[in-house]
C-alpha cells in the first residue's frame, strides 16, 4: 500500500477526558473553533494549542544574537539573580532571550496551559527530498518537504501552514470517515517498508518511554525554590557570624527535607514506569509477510496478528476479522470479558460517520487483555493499528498521571503574603539597625551582618520545615491505619474537603451481585398471568408446585454470554451465579483448536439439566445454543436462540431474552404481563435490588433461517416468564461512614456507571439521599426539542422508600434554561447522557446542577473526571474514592483521590487504602484537618517566636548589646525546634466536626492572633526591661566587656523564655480538629523539662551555666520572682486573648460577619459553590424573584419550580 494512499485513523487524545471515546474529534475541532473566536492566531506570535478539550495559549519566538548577548549580560551583572528569576517566571525568560516571531518561522514556542503553567519547547525540522506524508482531516496524506514540529507532554504537534495551527497528527487522523476503515479490511497485505519509515517520521515510537529523571536534576529543581535559597542565604550569614551550631541544624533539616522530596519524586516515576511495563514481541504483516518485531516498532496502519494465547494489547486497533474476547478492566473497571466483533459486521455508513463509542465493539484498546481469539480455519485474527504510544488509551492514562492538574496555589499564596508581612517588619528593623549602628560608629562589616541578621530573625528559614511537621505525623498515623500516601502535600488539602464522591460497585457496595429470589409467572383461575411467590432457588420442584412456567429455569441456564477459556467458564459474575443456581451442565468444545479455529462451522454450546431435573424436561434433555445476540446497552437486553428438537420436529427452537424490566415489557405480548407488573418492579427497585426480566417465544425455523433472521424480529412478541431479583449489598461500614460525613456537613456524592434507578435506591439505602429531603430526577427526551432547538429536559420527583421510587403520576414539566429549584431541602439525581446534554446544550445550568445533584448514574470514566472538574470549577474541595481503573481519571483529578485498589487506580490516586471500604475517607479528612490546623498553629508559633526574638534584639540594640550565642542557640535549637517538632504530634480528633477548618492561612483571625501576641510581647519584655534598668543595683555593661554578656540581656532572655513556652499551649488547641494537648505527652514532657531548665537558669547562679549562656547575675531574688510573675502574666493574658477574643470573637463572629457581607456584595473571591448554597439556604423562595413562577406539583406537594 503506497504511503500517499494511507488513510490514517482516529485519535481521541485528551488530558482531562482520559477515556474519551465517545465524541467525534473532528467535531470537537470544529466546535472549539466555533465557540472560541481566538482558536486561530490572534496576533503574529500568539496562537492556540488544542489538547482535547483544553485550549492552551501558544507563543512563538526565535533567537537573535543581540538578545542572547543581553540575556547573558543581565545574568553577569546581577550575579546570576536574573537567571534565577527567569527560571521561576518563564515569561521573563522569553521576553529577554527570544524575539517574538510568526509561527511559520519560530524556533521556540512557549505553551501556557489553563492553570498558568508555562513550558518552553524547541521547534524541530524534519526534511526529505522525496517528501514527508502527513495526515489531514480528510483522511488523506499530503506531502511536504519540510515538517516543523515540537513535542509537548509526550505528544507531537506539527505545524500546518494552511490551517495556521499546531496539530497532533493522531487528532488529524481522527477526521477520517469510518467507512475508510471498513474498506481497509480488504487490504491484508500490510504496509511496505517505505510506508513504515514515513510513518515513524510523523508518529512517535509505540512506547510509553519514561526515562527516570537523574537524581541530580530532581535535586537541582528542588533546591532552586525560593525557600531553599533563603535558607542557604541564612545559613551562610550564620556561619560568617560564627553561629555554626544552629546553622548546621538547619542544614541537616534542609538536606533531609530535600532528600525526602527527591525520594518521593523518584518513587512516583518508578511506579508509573512499572505500570507501563516492558515492551513485548508481536507479529505484524508487512508487504504480505508475517514478521516478528518489538511492539515499540508498530506504526499506525500496521496489521497486527493476534495470537490465540492471552496477551496485553500494545496499541489501539480495529478488529479486521474473526472475534476476540477481551478483558477491559483497565478501561471500565469491570473484569467481565467482552466479545469484540470485526469491522465486517459493522453496518455500512457514509463518509459523514466518524469513529465513536458506537464502534467500540470493533475496537481493541491498548492495555486491555486479549483472552481468546476465534476465526475461520487456517486464517489468523488480524487488527488494524489506529493509535500508538501516548495517543493510545493507556498512553492517555499515563499522561494524566504524569501531568496532573496542579494543586491550588491559595496556600502558597497565603504563605508568601505572610512572609511579605514579616519581611516588611524586618525591613523596619533593618533600617532601624543600620541607623542605630551607624550612629554608634560600628564597622561596615558589623553593620551588614547585624542588619541582615534581623531579616533571618523575623523571617524564620525553618518555617517550611516546621509547617511540614503536621503532614509528616499525619502520614505516619495514616500508614498505621493501612492508608498509604504517595503525595504528602495532599494531606493538608484533605482538611478542606467538603464534597466526597464515591464510586458505587466495589466501593459503597460489595463487588458482586447475589441471587436474592425469583418471581415466576403462572396462570390464575381466570387464565391471566400473575406472579408466584418468591423462590430462593431455581428449583423446578418448587416451581412446579405453584404451576410456574419452567422455561424460566432454561432461560437462566442458557441466556448468557459465558465463555469457556482453558476449561473454565468466564464472564459476567451475575450470569455465573445464575448458571450455578440452575445447576445445569454447559458443554463446549474442549480442545483449544476446536474452541478457536472452528468458527466457520455451527458448533453450538450444549446445555443439559442435572439428572435430578430430567423428569421436568421430558421432551428434551439437551438444548443447543445456536446463536447469541450479545448484550447491548442501547437495547438494554441480550438473547439466545436455542434448538429444542423433539420427536415431532427438528425445527423447534426457542428464543430466550433477558434485560431491563422496562425493555422486556415493551417486547412482550401484553396479555402475558401481570397487571401489577410495574408495582412489583418499583417495589423491588426502590429497595435497591437489581431486576432482570426474562421472556421467551417458540419459533419453527431451520438452522440457516434462524441464523439469518434479524434480531428485532426474533426479540418481538415474547412471552413474559418472570423476574430474577439480584442484590448488591452495601458494605458493612458504608451507612455509618456516609452518616458520619453528612453529620459533619460534608456533601456525599455517588458517581456510578450503574443505571439511575439502582443508583437512587442504593443512595437512599446508604444515606446519600437523606430521608428528610425530597429527591428529584433530571431526565431528557431523545425526541422532543424546546423552542430553541435544544434537547428538552424534565424533572421528576423521586419519593421516599416507603412509596414508589419514581412518581409516575405527578405532573412532569419541561425544565427551561432559566429554571432552578427553589429550596435547599431537596437533592437531585441525573444520568450521564442527561448530564452530557446539559454540559453541551445548557452550559449555564452546569454550575447549579453540579452544586445540587448528589447522584450521578450511567457516568462514563471521562464523565467522572469531567464532574470532578466541574465541582472544582465552582470552588468545591473534592475527594474521590473508587476501586477500579475506570476511576483513574477522577481519582487523579480530585483534590484527594483515595483508591481501594492495588492496580492502576492506586498509581493515579495519592492515597491507597489496604482496607477495601470507605472508612478511609473520614480518616483521611480527619487527619487532613489535623495536619492543616497544625500547619496553621506552627505558622503562628514560628511567627510569634520570630517577632518575640525580634523585639528582644531591638530592645538590646537600643542598649548597645545583643543576645549571646548561647542564648540564641538555646532559643532556636531547644525552645523552638523541639517544641515545633512535637507540636504536630497531637493526634486527630476522633469525631469529625461539622465546622470546617479555615480554608486559608491569611485570615483576620490569623493576623489578630500573631500581632496580638506581639503586643503582649512588647508589654512583657518592655516591663521587665524598664524595671531592671530602674533598680539601684543595676550596673550598665562596661565597654571593655563583650556586649552580649549583660544584665539587661539576661533580663530580656528570662522574660522571653516563658513567652516561648506559653506559645506552645496557646497554639496547641485541641477541639474540634485535634485531641487535647495533654494527650500529646511528648510535647507536655518537653515543655515540662524546658520549663524546669528555665527555672534553674532564673533562680540559680551556677558558674558554668552563666558562662555558657552569657548571663550576668541578677542580685535581687525578689526581682527574679517579679520577672517570672510578669512572664507568667503575659502567658496568661496571651491564653485568654487567644481563646476568648481570637477564637470566639474574631474567628467566629467577625469572620462570619465578613463572610455574610461578601455574600451580600457578591464578592468574586467567594466560590460559586458557596454562593449557590448560600442563596438557596437563605431564601427558600429565592427563585420566584427571578422567575416569578410557581406551581404545586400534584398531591405530593413537590417543589415549586419553573420547568
Swiss-Prot record:
The active site is at residue 503. SUPFAM superfamilies: Calcium ATPase, transduction domain A, Calcium ATPase, transmembrane domain M, HAD-like, Metal cation-transporting ATPase, ATP-binding domain N. The chain crosses the membrane at residues 69-89, 210-230, 243-263, 298-318, 415-435, 452-472, 936-956, 963-983, 1008-1028, 1047-1067, 1086-1106, 1121-1141. It catalyses: ATP + H2O = ADP + phosphate + H(+). Residues 21-42, 595-617 are annotated as: Disordered. The gene is catp-5. Residues 90-209, 264-297, 436-451, 957-962, 1029-1046, 1107-1120 are extracellular. The lineage of its organism: Eukaryota, Metazoa, Ecdysozoa, Nematoda, Chromadorea. Belongs to the cation transport ATPase (P-type) (TC 3.A.3) family. Type V subfamily. Pfam families: Cation_ATPase, E1-E2_ATPase, P5-ATPase. Its EC number is 7.2.2.-. Residues 1-68, 231-242, 319-414, 473-935, 984-1007, 1068-1085, 1142-1203 are cytoplasmic. This is Cation-transporting ATPase catp-5. It is a multi-pass membrane protein. GO terms for molecular function: ATP binding; ATP hydrolysis activity; ATPase-coupled monoatomic cation transmembrane transporter activity; metal ion binding; P-type ion transporter activity; polyamine transmembrane transporter activity. One of its GO terms (biological process) is intracellular calcium ion homeostasis. Disruption phenotype: Disrupts the polyamine uptake and/or transport of the polyamine conjugate Ant-4,4 and norspermidine, a toxic structural analog of the polyamine spermidine. Intracellular levels of the natural polyamines spermidine and putrescine are as wild-type. Double knockout with either odc-1 or smd-1 (two enzymes involved in polyamine synthesis) results in a reduced brood size, delayed postembryonic development and reduced intracellular levels of spermidine. GO terms for cellular component: apical plasma membrane; membrane. It is found in: Apical cell membrane. The keyword Signal does not apply. Keywords: ATP-binding, Cell membrane, Magnesium, Membrane, Metal-binding, Nucleotide-binding, Phosphoprotein, Translocase, Transmembrane, Transmembrane helix.
Amino acid at each position: 500500500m503506497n504511503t500517499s494512499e494511507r488513510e490514517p485513523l482516529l485519535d481521541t487524545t485528551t488530558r482531562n477526558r482520559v477515556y474519551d471515546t465517545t465524541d467525534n474529534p473532528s467535531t470537537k475541532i470544529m466546535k472549539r473553533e466555533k465557540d472560541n473566536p481566538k482558536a486561530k492566531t490572534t496576533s503574529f506570535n500568539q496562537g492556540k494549542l488544542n489538547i482535547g478539550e483544553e485550549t492552551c495559549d501558544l507563543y512563538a519566538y526565535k533567537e537573535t544574537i543581540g538578545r542572547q548577548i543581553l540575556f547573558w549580560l543581565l545574568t553577569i551583572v546581577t550575579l546570576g539573580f536574573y537567571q534565577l528569576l527567569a527560571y521561576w517566571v518563564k515569561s521573563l525568560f522569553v521576553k529577554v532571550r527570544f524575539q517574538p516571531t510568526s509561527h511559520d518561522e519560530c524556533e521556540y514556542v512557549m505553551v501556557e496551559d489553563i492553570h498558568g503553567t508555562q513550558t518552553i519547547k524547541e521547534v524541530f525540522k524534519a526534511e526529505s527530498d522525496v517528501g514527508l506524508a502527513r495526515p489531514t482531516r480528510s483522511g488523506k496524506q499530503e506531502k511536504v518537504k519540510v515538517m516543523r514540529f515540537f513535542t509537548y507532554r509526550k505528544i507531537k504537534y506539527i505545524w500546518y501552514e494552511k490551517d495556521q495551527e499546531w496539530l497532533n497528527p493522531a487528532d488529524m487522523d481522527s477526521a477520517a470517515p469510518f467507512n475508510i476503515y471498513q474498506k481497509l479490511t480488504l487490504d491484508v497485505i500490510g504496509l511496505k517498508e517505505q510506508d513504515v519509515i514515513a510513518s515513524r517520521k510523523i508518529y512517535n515510537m509505540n512506547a510509553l518511554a519514561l526515562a527516570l529523571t537523574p537524581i541530580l536534576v530532581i535535586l537541582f529543581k528542588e533546591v532552586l525554590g525560593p525557600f531553599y535559597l533563603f535558607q542557604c542565604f541564612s545559613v551562610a550569614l550564620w556561619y560568617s557570624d560564627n553561629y555554626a551550631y544552629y546553622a548546621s541544624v538547619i542544614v541537616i533539616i534542609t538536606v533531609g527535607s530535600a532528600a525526602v522530596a527527591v525520594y518521593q519524586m523518584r518513587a512516583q516515576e518508578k511506579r508509573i514506569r512499572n505500570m507501563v511495563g516492558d515492551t513485548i514481541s508481536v507479529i505484524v504483516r508487512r508487504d504480505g509477510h508475517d514478521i516478528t518485531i518489538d511492539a515499540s516498532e508498530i506504526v499506525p496502519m500496521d496489521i497486527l496478528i493476534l495470537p490465540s494465547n492471552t496477551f496485553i494489547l500494545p496499541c489501539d486497533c480495529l478488529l479486521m476479522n474473526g472475534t476476540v474476547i477481551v478483558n477491559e478492566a483497565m478501561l471500565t473497571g469491570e473484569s467481565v470479558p467482552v466479545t469484540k466483533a470485526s469491522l465486517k459486521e459493522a453496518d455500512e455508513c457514509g463518509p459523514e460517520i466518524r469513529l465513536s463509542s458506537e464502534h467500540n465493539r470493533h475496537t481493541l484498546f491498548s492495555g486491555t487483555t486479549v483472552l481468546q481469539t476465534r476465526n475461520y480455519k487456517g486464517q489468523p485474527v488480524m487488527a488494524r493499528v489506529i493509535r500508538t504510544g501516548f495517543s493510545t488509551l493507556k498512553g492517555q492514562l499515563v499522561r494524566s498521571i504524569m501531568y496532573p492538574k496542579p494543586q491550588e496555589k491559595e496556600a502558597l499564596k497565603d504563605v508568601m503574603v505572610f512572609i511579605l508581612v514579616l519581611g516588611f517588619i524586618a525591613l523596619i528593623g533593618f533600617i532601624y539597625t543600620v541607623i542605630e549602628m551607624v550612629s554608634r560608629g560600628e564597622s561596615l562589616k558589623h553593620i551588614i551582618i547585624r542588619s541582615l541578621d534581623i531579616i533571618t530573625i523575623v523571617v524564620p528559614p525553618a518555617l517550611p520545615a516546621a509547617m511540614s511537621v503536621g503532614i509528616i505525623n499525619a502520614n505516619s498515623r495514616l500508614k498505621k491505619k493501612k492508608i498509604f500516601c504517595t503525595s504528602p502535600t495532599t494531606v493538608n488539602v484533605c482538611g478542606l474537603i467538603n464534597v466526597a464522591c464515591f464510586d458505587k460497585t466495589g466501593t459503597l457496595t460489595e463487588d458482586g451481585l447475589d441471587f436474592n429470589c425469583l418471581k415466576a409467572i403462572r396462570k390464575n383461575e381466570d387464565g391471566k398471568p400473575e406472579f408466584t411467590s418468591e423462590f430462593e432457588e431455581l428449583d423446578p420442584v418448587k416451581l412446579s408446585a405453584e404451576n410456574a412456567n419452567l422455561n424460566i429455569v432454561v432461560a437462566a441456564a442458557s441466556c448468557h454470554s459465558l465463555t469457556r477459556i482453558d476449561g473454565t467458564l468466564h464472564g459476567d459474575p451475575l450470569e455465573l451465579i445464575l448458571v450455578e443456581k440452575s445447576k445445569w451442565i454447559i458443554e463446549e468444545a474442549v480442545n483449544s483448536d476446536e474452541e478457536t479455529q472452528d468458527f466457520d462451522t455451527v458448533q453450538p454450546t450444549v446445555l443439559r439439566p442435572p439428572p435430578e431435573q430430567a423428569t421436568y424436561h421430558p421432551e428434551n434433555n439437551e438444548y443447543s445454543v445456536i446463536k447469541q445476540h450479545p448484550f447491548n446497552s442501547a437495547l438494554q437486553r441480550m438473547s439466545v436462540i436455542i434448538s429444542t428438537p423433539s420427536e415431532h420436529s427438528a425445527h423447534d427452537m426457542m428464543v430466550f431474552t433477558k434485560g431491563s424490566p422496562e425493555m422486556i415489557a415493551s417486547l412482550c405480548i401484553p396479555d402475558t404481563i401481570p397487571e401489577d407488573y410495574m408495582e412489583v418492579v418499583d417495589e423491588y427497585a426502590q429497595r435497591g435490588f437489581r431486576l432482570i426480566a426474562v421472556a421467551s417465544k417458540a419459533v419453527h425455523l431451520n438452522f440457516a433461517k434462524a441464523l439469518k433472521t434479524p434480531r428485532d424480529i426474533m426479540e418481538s412478541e415474547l412471552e413474559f416468564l418472570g423476574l430474577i431479583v439480584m442484590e448488591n449489598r452495601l458494605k458493612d461500614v458504608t451507612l455509618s461512614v456516609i452518616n458520619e460525613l453528612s453529620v459533619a456537613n460534608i456533601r456525599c456524592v455517588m458517581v456510578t456507571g450503574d443505571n439511575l434507578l439502582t443508583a437512587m435506591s442504593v443512595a437512599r439505602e446508604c444515606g446519600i439521599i437523606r430521608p428528610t429531603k425530597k429527591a428529584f430526577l433530571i431526565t431528557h427526551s431523545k425526541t422532543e426539542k424546546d423552542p430553541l432547538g435544544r434537547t428538552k429536559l424534565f424533572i421528576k420527583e423521586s419519593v421516599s422508600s416507603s412509596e414508589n421510587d419514581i412518581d409516575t403520576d405527578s405532573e412532569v414539566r419541561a425544565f427551561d434554561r432559566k429554571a432552578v429549584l427553589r429550596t435547599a431541602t431537596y437533592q437531585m439525581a441525573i444520568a450521564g447522557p442527561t448530564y452530557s446534554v446539559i454540559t453541551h446544550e445548557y452550559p449555564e445550568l452546569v454550575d447549579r446542577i453540579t452544586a445540587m445533584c448528589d447522584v450521578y448514574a450511567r457516568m462514563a470514566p471521562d464523565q467522572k473526571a469531567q464532574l470532578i472538574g466541574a465541582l472544582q470549577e465552582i470552588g468545591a474541595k473534592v475527594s474521590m474514592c473508587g476501586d477500579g481503573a475506570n476511576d483513574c481519571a477522577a481519582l487523579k483529578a480530585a483534590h484527594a483521590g483515595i483508591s481501594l485498589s492495588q492496580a492502576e487506580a492506586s498509581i493515579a490516586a495519592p492515597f491507597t487504602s489496604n482496607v477495601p471500604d470507605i472508612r478511609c475517607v473520614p480518616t483521611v479528612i480527619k487527619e487532613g484537618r489535623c495536619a492543616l490546623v497544625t500547619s496553621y498553629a506552627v505558622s503562628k508559633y514560628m511567627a510569634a517566636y520570630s517577632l518575640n526574638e525580634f523585639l528582644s534584639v531591638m530592645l538590646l540594640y537600643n542598649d548597645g548589646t545583643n543576645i549571646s550565642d548561647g542564648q540564641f542557640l538555646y532559643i532556636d535549637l531547644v525552645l523552638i525546634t523541639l517544641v515545633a517538632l512535637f507540636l504536630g504530634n497531637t493526634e486527630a480528633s476522633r469525631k469529625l466536626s461539622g465546622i470546617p477548618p479555615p480554608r486559608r492561612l491569611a485570615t483576620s483571625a490569623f493576623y489578630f492572633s500573631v500581632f496580638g501576641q506581639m503586643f503582649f510581647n512588647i508589654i512583657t519584655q518592655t516591663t521587665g526591661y524598664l524595671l531592671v534598668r530602674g533598680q539601684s543595683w543595676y550596673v550598665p555593661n562596661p565597654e571593655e566587656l563583650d556586649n552580649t554578656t549583660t544584665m539587661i540581656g539576661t533580663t530580656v532572655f528570662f522574660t522571653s523564655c516563658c513567652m516561648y513556652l506559653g506559645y506552645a499551649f496557646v497554639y496547641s488547641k485541641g477541639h474540634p480538629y485535634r485531641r487535647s494537648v495533654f494527650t500529646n505527652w511528648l510535647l507536655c514532657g518537653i515543655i515540662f523539662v524546658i520549663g524546669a531548665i528555665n527555672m534553674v537558669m532564673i533562680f540559680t547562679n551556677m558558674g558554668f551555666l552563666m558562662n555558657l549562656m552569657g548571663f550576668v547575675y541578677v542580685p535581687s531574688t525578689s526581682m527574679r520572682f517579679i520577672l517570672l510573675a510578669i512572664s507568667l502574666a503575659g502567658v496568661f493574658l496571651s491564653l485568654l486573648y487567644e481563646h476568648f477574643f481570637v477564637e470566639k470573637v474574631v474567628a467566629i463572629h467577625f469572620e462570619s460577619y465578613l463572610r455574610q457581607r461578601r455574600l451580600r456584595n457578591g464578592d468574586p473571591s467567594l466560590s460559586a459553590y458557596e454562593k449557590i448554597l448560600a442563596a438557596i439556604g437563605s431564601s427558600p423562595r429565592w427563585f420566584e424573584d427571578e422567575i416569578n413562577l410557581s406551581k404545586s406539583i400534584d398531591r405530593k406537594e413537590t417543589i415549586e419550580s419553573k420547568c
